[in-house]
């Protein structure tokens, strides 16, 4: 997720299991552990310049870097792989790979054996990290946010991104698609307007998406392509910044420019709120769609002017779950919620004020 910088933050990303997050900044890069919140390391401006994008590979020593901001050292058309395990104090010695294109890189995704690089109208997939070679490239409709998601599971190599048709999703099984071919990916007609946010659950069995309208989140089975459930964020349009599943796919959270993080139940959807009209009986088709939607089980607010990413924390007990929100204004929010919809703040911090003297 990227936004105009507040306090120098240009983008934020969780790692693949949401146990860490990385922060691209005007002053370099910072890496944080989520629970407990602590800085794990940083790359300063002298080493990397101002950064536009950073992507982690789990909790490993590898980072993908894309230059950006007001004083970049690296180009916005290149992805550089930083290996902190490499000996040497010179930053050049730690830059072990470079992927260069003719247009700006909008996002990067990594898994243990592949790296995905997203441009405005094209997606590239390479083997990674040893002896990288291009495996696939896919043309897309205009994708200015660089939307895509990559399943981290060892069992499923699923890639999802906006399809050619407005509001559609394309799913590609990278394990069964032959490298060098342009076999047609599976398509899901998810929305009527352009896709604004997309996310896979950890095993890659469910994909969630929202359109630019931002009122509905729809979930689909990645195998059958059938719609599983429709979740209603609200009635007024909003820009969704982030959608994430809990580790066991029992819950889903979503953040938007309304300054609200919504939490939905997926395993037991009876926990979600329903429209009062649902008890009225038969209604017309347009109202019927509204009535059938499920509203969030719980929600909490963060500063509305500050974009944020959200994810689920570690469970503290069987009936208590938590959601973490990381905002570009430098704030960290942790809320706990129960199945009956109670939601309370458990922790607040300013992660930009947490410093560690060690480099990454």
UniProtKB/Swiss-Prot annotation:
Q: Please state the span of the N-terminal signal peptide per the UniProt entry.
A: none
Q: What is the effect of changing residue 55 to A?
A: No effect on interaction with ATG2A
Activity regulation details: Activated upon amino-acid starvation.
Consequence of mutating residue 109 to A?
Answer: No effect on interaction with ATG2A
In alphabetical order, the GO MF annotations are: phosphatidylinositol phosphate binding; phosphatidylinositol-3,5-bisphosphate binding; phosphatidylinositol-3-phosphate binding; protein kinase binding; protein-macromolecule adaptor activity
Self-association and partners:
Interacts with WIPI1. Interacts with WIPI2. Interacts with ATG2A and ATG2B. Interacts with ULK1. May interact with the PRKAA1, PRKAA2, PRKAB1 and PRKAG1 subunits of the AMPK kinase. May interact with NUDC.
Localization per record: Preautophagosomal structure; Cytoplasm
Q: Which gene encodes it?
A: WDR45
This protein's species is Homo sapiens (Human)
Q: In which tissues is it expressed?
A: Ubiquitously expressed, with high expression in skeletal muscle and heart. Weakly expressed in liver and placenta. Expression is down-regulated in pancreatic and in kidney tumors.
Name of protein: WD repeat domain phosphoinositide-interacting protein 4
Q: Name one GO cellular component term.
A: cytosol
UniProt keyword annotations, A-Z: Autophagy, Cytoplasm, Disease variant, Lipid-binding, Neurodegeneration, Repeat, WD repeat
PANTHER family from the entry?
WD-REPEAT PROTEIN INTERACTING WITH PHOSPHOINOSIDES WIPI -RELATED (PTHR11227)
Name the job this protein performs. Answer: Component of the autophagy machinery that controls the major intracellular degradation process by which cytoplasmic materials are packaged into autophagosomes and delivered to lysosomes for degradation. Binds phosphatidylinositol 3-phosphate (PtdIns3P). Activated by the STK11/AMPK signaling pathway upon starvation, WDR45 is involved in autophagosome assembly downstream of WIPI2, regulating the size of forming autophagosomes.
Q: Where on this chain is L/FRRG motif (motif)?
A: 231-234
Top-level taxon = Eukaryota
**Domain comment, in the record's words?**
The L/FRRG motif is required for recruitment to PtdIns3P.
Q: What does the record say mutating residue 112 to A does?
A: No effect on interaction with ATG2A
Which disease is the protein involved in? Neurodegeneration with brain iron accumulation 5: A neurodegenerative disorder associated with iron accumulation in the brain, primarily in the basal ganglia. NBIA5 is characterized by global developmental delay in early childhood that is essentially static, with slow motor and cognitive gains until adolescence or early adulthood. In young adulthood, affected individuals develop progressive dystonia, parkinsonism, extrapyramidal signs, and dementia resulting in severe disability.
Q: Does the keyword Cytoplasm apply?
A: yes
